[in-house]
From Swiss-Prot:
SUPFAM superfamilies in alphabetical order: P-loop containing nucleoside triphosphate hydrolases
Residue positions binding ATP: G114, P115, S116, G117, T118, G119, K120, T121
SS bond partners: none
Protein name: Insertion sequence IS21-like putative ATP-binding protein
Keyword 4Fe-4S: no
Gene3D superfamilies in UniProt: P-loop containing nucleotide triphosphate hydrolases
UniProt organism field: Bacteroides fragilis
Molecular function as annotated in GO: ATP binding; ATP hydrolysis activity
Lineage top rank: taxon: Bacteria
Record keyword Amino-acid biosynthesis present: no
UniProt keyword terms in alphabetical order: ATP-binding, Nucleotide-binding, Transposable element
Family under the similarity heading: Belongs to the IS21/IS1162 putative ATP-binding protein family.
Amino acid sequence: MKSSMAMIKHKKELVEYARHLKLPNLAEHVGVILHEAQEKQLTYSEFLANCLAREIQGRERKSYLTRLKLSGLPAKYDLDLYDYDRAEGMDNRRLRELRELVWVNQAYNLLLVGPSGTGKTFIAAGLVYEAVKAGYEAYLMTLEELLTCLKTKEVSAHAMKTYKRIMKARLLAIDDATLFPLKREEAVLLFKLVNDFQERTSLIITANKALTRWLETLEDEAVTAALLDRLLYCCEIIRLGGTSYRMQNRKTIFSNQNTDIGT
């Protein structure tokens, strides 16, 4: 009886100490840790190690969930579901190497080029997810979202907060980079960002056309050359092909699906 009362007293004290030291995960699991120590007759050092390990595990889990929430990932991003039979330009070996993230550690860039519906965004999102799991800060955003952030960061607290986050990132995926023409002032903003990222942060860029064709509309050879030089420096270019996944799996409101899409 005395032993049980002492255990309860020690548990309450440990919970109070843990909360005072801002160790919420330890405070939450003190009872489990004490029970395990008693059952296994752990040494003092083993008990202390268990206490610290529980706190570290909780913090790492919280950090992971925060990174995942802020990453901007779409609903589907699991590369284990990637359809190699449908896609052209990405095989199992190549994707496995990309998932190992060695290129991120080396600050290499990745350019995914191909028609709409060939898996560019899915691959980019999947690699961002792999980086998040590995403990990196990684984000996925469209070029339009990125440019809006860069243009408004001086007048918008939300934009400045987003800007500060992406400046700390190890990986930034820019989706739909060539969807719209780029204005000269936008190209300059993008150049400054990419220049700051060089040899520090990896970029993934998804594009439905070659970057050279996209930047032809700038009519400014100096800006075009500088931006291309930064974007393609230490860059692996992967060209994706095949039929559009969205067209093959499009949904209809009718019971008998008609494949005629009016083209």
